[in-house]
Amino acid sequence: MNQTKSRDIPLYIYHAGQCDPKKCTGRKMARFELARLYDRISRLPRSAILLDPMAEKALSPADDPKKGIIVLDCSWEEVERVFPELEKLNLEHRALPYMLAGNPVNFGRPFKLNSAEAFAAALYILGYKEQAEKVMSKFNWGHSFLELNREPLEEYSTAKNSTEIVEIQSHYI
């Protein structure tokens, strides 16, 4: 697989406005024009990849991210409310494999990634490593996430499909 891809993948955030604006990674990404914020589900692009922790299929390099990647930046209660609306959008639901958070709030906790970390992980796995590094470069703790997860991210990025991702993940859990 290529070390990096030439064009950046569009990144989208459904932002419910429920977080501390000073700590919100989604808002910061939007300020740096790394992602677009949406406050309505109906405005999200169709056919994109939705990073969904409850998805049956793991994100893998076999997925086509050209239509973009979507992250939900909201509470779990809000997720339950919006999921019926999300079903109408024809999105590709994908779960991220095992990784540790590098952010100060959840440092070292498995699966507790914030929006920026979720995007960086997805981009890295899909082969867009430079874009992943660009996202993380905007946060003073961003290097921690990439360093903590360098080995699994490299392995995940070599997988052929979702099944291989799950196999690789089993070595880290």
Curated annotation (Swiss-Prot):
- Has the keyword Cytoplasm been applied to this entry? yes
Quickly give the catalysed reaction.
an N(1)-methylpseudouridine in rRNA + S-adenosyl-L-methionine = N(1)-methyl-N(3)-[(3S)-3-amino-3-carboxypropyl]pseudouridine in rRNA + S-methyl-5'-thioadenosine + H(+)
Q: Does the keyword S-adenosyl-L-methionine apply?
A: yes
GO terms under biological process: enzyme-directed rRNA pseudouridine synthesis
Q: What is its EC number?
A: 2.5.1.157
Using the chain's own numbering, where are the disulfide bonds? none
Q: A Gene Ontology MF term for this entry? A: S-adenosyl-L-methionine binding
Q: Which Pfam family, an example, fits this chain?
A: Fer4_RLI
Compartments reported by the entry? Cytoplasm
Signal peptide bounds: none
Give the similarity note.
Answer: Belongs to the TDD superfamily. TSR3 family.
* Role played: Aminocarboxypropyltransferase that catalyzes the aminocarboxypropyl transfer on pseudouridine corresponding to position 914 in M.jannaschii 16S rRNA. It constitutes the last step in biosynthesis of the hypermodified N1-methyl-N3-(3-amino-3-carboxypropyl) pseudouridine (m1acp3-Psi).
What is this protein called in UniProt?
16S rRNA aminocarboxypropyltransferase
